[in-house]
Amino acid sequence: MQAQIVNKIFEIFSKNNPSPKTELIYKNDFTLLVAVMLSAQATDISVNLATKSLFETYDTTEKILELGEDGLKKYIKSIGLFNSKAKNIIALCKILISNYQSSVPNDFKELIKLPGVGRKTANVVLNCLFGMPTMAVDTHVFRVAKRIGLARGNSPEIVEKELLQIINEKWLTHAHHWLILHGRYICKARKPDCDICPIKEYCEYYNSPIISK
């Protein structure tokens, strides 16, 4: 896709939503990290429902450790993979306390050393908490980027690299939020709402001859 078309797409995203934010609800740096970890293979809605009562009382590494793994499971049992997520969160709390004075590190390499933290989680944290121009590739970003024509890769990591190369730096701070929200509400997995899509004239999928309009 030509750079001028990519710029036009993100100009439209920016005009329609100048300051996009994560839809995960959190109280501080630590609770955002926990929420993002819980969001793996789960919806933001389901995570917010589970963490509402959890974060009201347990919003620090020390408090989560006091709650314990079994106690944590009771709060997050409605979320997929809650057993392994609870185990990772408890292990993560211990490391944050011992190695980082309970603070969330602002370094990618340090973040991905933590239990349960992969590339996507690390990139979300760096972007949302520290304003870094990262590209967190979840299922929405992966699908939308390939459907629009922004990327061709067959893995999230390759798509991440492609997007970082093709998207102008001035858009990168908000780019992954725009792509997520576009995928969540318009460019849906099974049936994209092309009729209301603000970027359809630039979309390879929409302009494909095999697509009925």
From Swiss-Prot:
GO terms for biological process: base-excision repair, AP site formation. The keyword 4Fe-4S applies. InterPro entries: DNA_glycosylase, Endonuclease-III-like_CS2, Endonuclease3_FeS-loop_motif, HhH-GPD_domain, HhH_base_excis_C, HhH_motif, Nth. Residues 108-127 form the HhH domain. SUPFAM superfamilies: DNA-glycosylase. Keywords: 4Fe-4S, DNA damage, DNA repair, DNA-binding, Glycosidase, Hydrolase, Iron, Iron-sulfur, Lyase, Metal-binding. Its EC number is 4.2.99.18. One of its GO terms (molecular function) is DNA binding. Belongs to the Nth/MutY family. HAMAP family: Nth (MF_00942). DNA repair enzyme that has both DNA N-glycosylase activity and AP-lyase activity. The DNA N-glycosylase activity releases various damaged pyrimidines from DNA by cleaving the N-glycosidic bond, leaving an AP (apurinic/apyrimidinic) site. The AP-lyase activity cleaves the phosphodiester bond 3' to the AP site by a beta-elimination, leaving a 3'-terminal unsaturated sugar and a product with a terminal 5'-phosphate. This is Endonuclease III.
